[in-house]
Design a protein with these regions (language model features):
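Von Willebrand factor
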Residues: 1-37, 62-65, 69, 78-85, ...
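Charged, alpha-helix-enriched surfaces in structured cytosolic catalytic cores
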Residues: 2-6, 39, 43, 54-61, ...
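Secondary-structure boundary motif
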Residues: 16, 50-53, 72-76, 116
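Short beta-strand-loop
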Residues: 19-50, 70-73, 95-98, 130-140, ...
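N-linked glycosylation sequons
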Residues: 56, 64-68, 75-76, 112-115, ...
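VWA/integrin I-like adhesion module and closely mimicked acidic/polar interface patches used
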Residues: 88-140, 146
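C-terminal helix of von Willebrand factor
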Residues: 137-167
Length: 167
């Protein structure tokens, strides 16, 4: 719930700056692009409302989808950043199979691909306690890791703004 609140604040700020925002959800056995890059605050909030929580965490699939969207945005002259908000460890691999070890390797592979493309961003851990492995993932991406246990939406929003300010 707090992650959704933080995203709503970020959307309002992005709208004020006339930035484009895209939403990628990763759950179950894969990732879905809920919304391609848009400036529509109403449409983005509507899609955000459809975002379910819980279940498997196909983190690598989410990172792959975010990377693909970022590359498309770059091709259109935009300067994309990736803000990953999650409260879970990768437990579904790129093939959609529940395999924690392979899922972690796949997530690192995608993190290195994001780093290789020179994309900025950050990893925000929204869990009640720091989630083991997300700091390693951020290191692989060469982006900040922000563990925000029990943080409210404004704290998450401020952290994202600070980390992405130079993007």
């Amino acid at each position: 719930a707090e992650a959704k609140g933080a995203i709503e604040l970020l959307l309002g700020e992005a709208y004020a700056r006339r930035d484009h925002v895209a939403l990628v959800a990763f759950r179950g056995d894969g990732a879905d692009i809920l919304l391609p890059p848009t400036r529509s605050l109403v449409q983005t909030k509507r899609r955000l409302g459809q975002l379910p929580g819980g279940g498997g965490t196909p983190l690598a699939s989410g990172l792959r989808a975010a990377l693909e969207l970022a590359e498309l945005a770059k091709g259109k002259g935009m300067t994309p950043s990736i803000a990953l908000l999650t409260d879970g460890r990768a437990n579904v691999d790129l093939a959609g199979i529940a395999n924690r070890a392979q899922a972690a390797e796949d997530a690192k592979l995608m993190a290195r691909a994001i780093r290789a493309k020179g994309l900025s961003g950050l990893v925000i851990d929204t869990g009640l306690r720091p989630t083991r492995g997300l700091d390693d993932l951020a290191r692989e991406m060469r982006v900040p890791y922000l563990p925000l246990p029990r943080a409210d939406a404004r704290a998450v929003s401020s952290a994202v703004d600070a980390a992405l300010e130079g993007a």
